[in-house]
Amino acid sequence: MESIEQQLTELRTTLCHHEYLYHVMDAPEIPDAEYDRLMRELRELETKHPELITPDSPTQRVGAAPLAAFSQIRHEVPMLSLDNVFDEESFLAFNKRVQDRLKNNEKVTWCCELKLDGLAVSILYENGVLVSAATRGDGTTGEDITSNVRTIRAIPLKLHGENIPARLEVRGEVFLPQAGFEKINEDARRTGGKVFANPRNAAAGSLRQLDPRITAKRPLTFFCYGVGVLEGGELPDTHLGRLLQFKKWGVPVSDRVTLCESAEEVLAFYHKVEEDRPTLGFDIDGVVIKVNSLEQQEQLGFVARAPRWAVAFKFPAQEQMTFVRDVEFQVGRTGAITPVARLEPVHVAGVLVSNATLHNADEIERLGLRIGDKVVIRRAGDVIPQVVNVVLSERPEDTREVVFPTHCPVCGSDVERVEGEAVARCTGGLICGAQRKESLKHFVSRRAMDVDGMGDKIIDQLVEKEYVHTPADLFKLTAGKLTGLERMGPKLAQNVVNALEKAKETTFARFLYALGIREVGEATAAGLAAYFGTLEALEAASIEELQKVPDVGIVVASHVHNFFAEESNRNVISELLAEGVHWPAPIVINAEEIDSPFAGKTVVLTGSLSQMSRDDAKARLVELGAKVAGSVSKKTDLVIAGEAAGSKLAKAQELGIEVIDEAEMLRLLGS
């Protein structure tokens, strides 16, 4: 039996070695036929000795039984998105912001990568073995695609090499090469199956198959671009260093990753990649530019849901020509009137486009647009279609002027445009059915009050039937009233009522965001909630006081102040509170007023804790006035080291930062 085990081990080692050479090093040593022969030999041996099959065997990529549905995986470290720039001027402005924020004349080097047009995934390895994989999802929670990811040959089931961390989350992009995409569509046309519009859709559809056996037949591949969870091990202190280390462990990394010493070198890299784009063999839509130093990344931090130390420099979007058949005007949540061009449908970058935004009246005037014109359409950022210009040389004789409305197309209220602003707005407020619908949709959305099951179509019907006028009216709904809506049976109606009841318990930050105050997104709402602590304090705040909140300037402060000065808004808030909407009392975290050994200190947690979860530890430290950071820098005051602490502990010792263990932390928390 020992000889069989040895034979299996040698075959698996040989196959993994050749997968590494093929997918990571791009330097295969053997023909595909020889690889296939070795795989057949391994599969035959494992069939005869199923008790010796291991989870990391190359044969285990073929796919398991179909799933009924995907389960959810919560990301321990959120998967953030990136801000975009679309021209050199915007990139240079980003470069200047980075330099200005560092304020210490430190040299910034940039790690530049291809922006792959695929699907972002996170892959967790424990002791070097792949244990789970998830999609990005909403950034905090993704779908469990472990079975499907295991079928992708480019992704190692087991890392090889030395000093592999106990827990390592590899992040990257799963994508479909152009040749594989064409083959899939060729097969689909021959068999009458689904034809995909572009490789990204094909990759996403392949990766989100409930049957992993289907995924296994798709030639998906993968490139790593970063790290999430890191426990029980060390990594280099530069982004490029980390990517090179991943490559040594067997994780595929693009060979186009380049270190640039200046903004000029970054621009040269961008233009070179743009030139090479047609010959790459897979789709990209730009380059990603990251500050290479991890210490500088820590100093720069994050804003909302994106890092300040990275940006995606997008390529010019693909363009097509078509005709404008009409221009209609939509009314948004804040009353903004947006002209929308109705187009003769045309395919742009693999997507059928029939509408395009015209932004505002100034944009229509700038374009000189008339109804009936031939126009150039671009998918800005490869996402939102917009009209780039009018083809004046081919203007038909029967074009018509675009007349911007003076009254709301929905409620008839006056349309006003404040001097200095580009946007015209309906003055109807919640009297306007369109504003009411959009405001309510925002109020119940996942990141606001998070009312499960309350979809857009339900909101539309509630407003049209005049069941609901303000957000507070939602909490007065009964199952009986809801059953009067289309496709709303008693069970679903009761589920919605239960969800509304559950949503009454929220947080101050979510509540503020749900109110839909102009210019107040999630990050600003969280900042206001943390600074003022109570609704009463925020309502009473002056414009000057509001500007003391980080990232709140005069414009946002004015919008917040004006919102709470409006009697109708205060009445809606009072009604919501009367209906039972509530949140926990604020936790005082003024370090100057807290008698705690952690007050005012920047603390970093590393390693695993045995007596409490990391989240609980963070919460207790924040309550006691600490700022909990994610990495060690010169600004760190204290490092708490649990079991298997790695690079953070080493860096703390190198910098002479105070280090305590979990037992000492618990003692201090108790004091």
Swiss-Prot record:
It catalyses: NAD(+) + (deoxyribonucleotide)n-3'-hydroxyl + 5'-phospho-(deoxyribonucleotide)m = (deoxyribonucleotide)n+m + AMP + beta-nicotinamide D-nucleotide. SMART domains: BRCT, HhH1, LIGANc. Zn(2+) binds at residues 408, 411, 426, 432. Keywords: DNA damage, DNA repair, DNA replication, Ligase, Magnesium, Manganese, Metal-binding, NAD, Zinc. GO terms for molecular function: DNA binding; DNA ligase (NAD+) activity; metal ion binding. GO terms for cellular component: cytosol. The keyword Cytoplasm does not apply. It is an enzyme of class 6 (ligase). GO terms for biological process: DNA repair; DNA replication. The active site is at 115 (n6-amp-lysine intermediate). InterPro entries: BRCT_dom, BRCT_dom_sf, DisA/LigA_HHH, DNA_ligase, DNA_ligase_AS, DNA_ligase_CS, DNAligase_adenylation, DNAligase_N. CDD domains: BRCT_DNA_ligase_like, LIGANc. Signal peptide: none annotated. Its cofactor is Mg(2+); Mn(2+). It comes from the Bacteria. Residues 593-671 form the BRCT domain. Its EC number is 6.5.1.2. DNA ligase that catalyzes the formation of phosphodiester linkages between 5'-phosphoryl and 3'-hydroxyl groups in double-stranded DNA using NAD as a coenzyme and as the energy source for the reaction. It is essential for DNA replication and repair of damaged DNA. Belongs to the NAD-dependent DNA ligase family. LigA subfamily. This is DNA ligase. The lineage of its organism: Bacteria, Pseudomonadati, Pseudomonadota, Gammaproteobacteria, Enterobacterales.
